[in-house]
Amino acid sequence: MGMYAGYYRISDAELEQLRQLEERALLKRVEELTEDETAETCDLDKMWDVLRAEVCDLDKMWDALHFVLTGDTLSDTADHDPLSEAVCGSDFLLTQEMHVGGIPARRVKEIAQALHEVDFAARLAALQMSDFAAAEIYPNIWDRPEEEDDIRAELQEC
């Protein structure tokens, strides 16, 4: 199992409805979103496409993507950091089983602009796999030198 990230475009009204749900209903609604086969998957060649797409699935690379974008772990990131919000959201709906984060529509343009200004390839190239390991970035795959090229390629696709 493990932790993974999926991204869905919903309206502010839908985000507010999610905020109002009890834990069991919230889990059910999120499950419905993840099983919606009519939603389009995003083009992962450019991260800012996440903000325009219906669905984006980063699987288990969300924490590594956050680290490349911000240089910090999620717990160390400053409030209102648009690059952090792009990965984790800003309005948090927590349950015992999952973290659900939302981004209000008013923040999307600023976050998209911040993503557009990032030289992701340069940031990724500046990091060593040992940097991810030292920061305890999930998933724990950073001690596999034979997979480094594949890991970097997967992160670049994010």
Show which residues each predicted segment covers.
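Acidic (Asp/Glu-rich) sequence patches and key acidic residues
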Residues: 1-157
